[in-house]
Amino acid sequence: MKLDFAGERVLAVVAHPDDVELLCAGTLARGREDGATVGMCTMCRGNRGMAAGESANERSFGVSEVRQGEFTAAAKLLGAEVFFGGIGDGELEDIPKQRRELISIFRRYRPTLVLAHAPNDYHADHRAAFELAEAASWFACSAGHVTGEEPLERPPALWLMDTVEMHDFSPGFYVDVSEHVPLKRDMLGCHKSQLERAGDSDFAPLEQLMLRQAQVRGEQAGTEAAEAFRIHTVWKRVRAW
């Protein structure tokens, strides 16, 4: 299929503040290039993203604010609107209160296309973020779910993003992001608090992970760099391109 994002309102719904750069920043940049409006929503605050050896007491105060600032700075480079779910790391789940928050975000932003985590990604917050995005994409159109904003006229299309490290994900299609790798790197560079964790034994160096994934998906697609997706084929969340 030939993608043209002109006129679209694309919203990436991710679990953590640095997930966009790893999985879909190049596609959002492609959208902006085509004339789309793009947005980024992180459901979790990133409050537990601290270096090994540091106690919660040492860094818990202010971590959320730091990561919110990093997320906002990265979005500014892209020209994206930002939204925050405000949930603590590890506490994300598909429950009514969290659904209502994302439904409200959908109704304020009014996306035509949502990029969401794959339902089998490695992190529990990623899987919960998918469940919330999938549910909100439907209930945001229902007048029975009252949030104070007007319901959407129709559900947005829903694309599933690649999994981190490409585990157990069969791409349905690829987006060529070769020209946007420098922007992905610049955006990732905004997340200084996480880049400082590169030496942690339990934390993958983010830039290496991001570049390796873009390169491998690019090789599969016959281009320098790519991001992989799959269309979520459920009723009214599918449309022709």
Where are these regions (language model features)?
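Active-site rim/loop-helix segments in enzyme catalytic domains that contact anionic ligands
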Residues: 1-109, 230
